[in-house]
């Protein structure tokens, strides 16, 4: 009989649930829904990943519906997934607020009546797609007052992250590098500072290109990662989705386990005391 192995109770029980506001989730990998080869590829990748939270661009979903086309929203089982509507494409705070309200209508039609989540994106920069810190702060404050669970996408700015936490944001979502670039962890020091200072979940969003990069930020103490292009543009999206899932889980376990101290000198693996010469 093979020996069985189970994780310590503190890893797999309620103490390590990923919580946003008053909702708990079992997976710390969140997925985007754009850039897939086709609709079925997206659905299969999401299913393989084990992700609980899937983000959908409100504008794209609305435009697809208006054109009478089948979209990803119609193809997913929303009794098993939590939709995170986002304000992608909004260039101002005012526009983001308006689109967020439209997103609430879509969410309610899917039967998630207690879902007030919004991924806030205010991006006037069309070249590098860098978020507007002032517009984000302005829109976040308004949406929080309206009862939204606000999850702002931001640059890797520790001061802004703390300001957003202080006004009541449920999470902060700093970028690792520009959206869709696959450049990886270009702001690692700032991400470390944000994670260290935060009392709310820190979700690393944008720029992650490989599972090792996802695992690295989880090792540092990030609460979760959101991945889209790295999976959607992989040669085999389903395999990459599985790899990302394993990396996120591995990184989280590493963080909980605690890394060994780094030593300047070598230390023998086996004790030499008592060994005869």
UniProtKB/Swiss-Prot annotation:
Recorded family membership: Belongs to the ThiG family.
UniProt xrefs under InterPro entries: Aldolase_TIM, Thiazole_synthase_ThiG, ThiG
Protein name, as recorded: Thiazole synthase
UniProt keyword annotations, A-Z: Chloroplast, Plastid, Schiff base, Thiamine biosynthesis, Transferase
Primary role: Catalyzes the rearrangement of 1-deoxy-D-xylulose 5-phosphate (DXP) to produce the thiazole phosphate moiety of thiamine. Sulfur is provided by the thiocarboxylate moiety of the carrier protein ThiS. In vitro, sulfur can be provided by H(2)S.
UniProt GO molecular function: thiazole synthase activity
GO biological process: thiamine diphosphate biosynthetic process
The keyword Plastid is assigned to this record: yes
Positions annotated as active site in the UniProt record: 119
Organism: Porphyra purpurea (Red seaweed)
EC number: 2.8.1.10
Recorded GO CC terms: chloroplast
Statement: the UniProt record of this protein carries the keyword Transferase: yes
Reaction catalyzed: [ThiS sulfur-carrier protein]-C-terminal-Gly-aminoethanethioate + 2-iminoacetate + 1-deoxy-D-xylulose 5-phosphate = [ThiS sulfur-carrier protein]-C-terminal Gly-Gly + 2-[(2R,5Z)-2-carboxy-4-methylthiazol-5(2H)-ylidene]ethyl phosphate + 2 H2O + H(+)
Transmembrane segments: none
Compartments (UniProt record): Plastid, Chloroplast
Pathway: Cofactor biosynthesis; thiamine diphosphate biosynthesis
Pfam families attached to this UniProt entry: ThiG
Subunit structure: Homotetramer. Forms heterodimers with either ThiH or ThiS.
Annotated residues for binding of 1-deoxy-D-xylulose 5-phosphate: 180, 206-207, 228-229
